[in-house]
Amino acid sequence: MQRSSACMGISVPTRAQTDLPKQRSSACMGISVPARAQSDLPKQKSSACMGISVPARAQSDLPKQRKQRLYGNKCPGPSAAQLPGADRQRLYEKKWPGRSAVQPAG
């Protein structure tokens, strides 16, 4: 019963995560798994080829992290070429006068 309800986005306790079959754990994106329980999942073996272990909800960041892990600083992605905060702020205000990239607090 618990396995069938796991596909509906219900958080399952860590001890129940470990006995999920590999196909089911990779097919159910609705399960929220804490990072420390991720290492217990059978799915971890299939994603180990990427060299990154992330919680399921952080999957969208994978390509960026993978590039950084594989190439380091040799081939920086577009995000590495961004300007520091103050210069970026000045550029933003030059493009859109009247707007500010930094919102005032409150």
Curated annotation (Swiss-Prot):
Domain of life: Viruses
Stretches for region Disordered: 1-25, 55-106
Start-end of Basic and acidic residues biased regions: 87-96
Keywords (A to Z) from UniProt: Signal
Endpoints of the signal sequence: 1-18
Protein name as it appears in the record: Protein B9
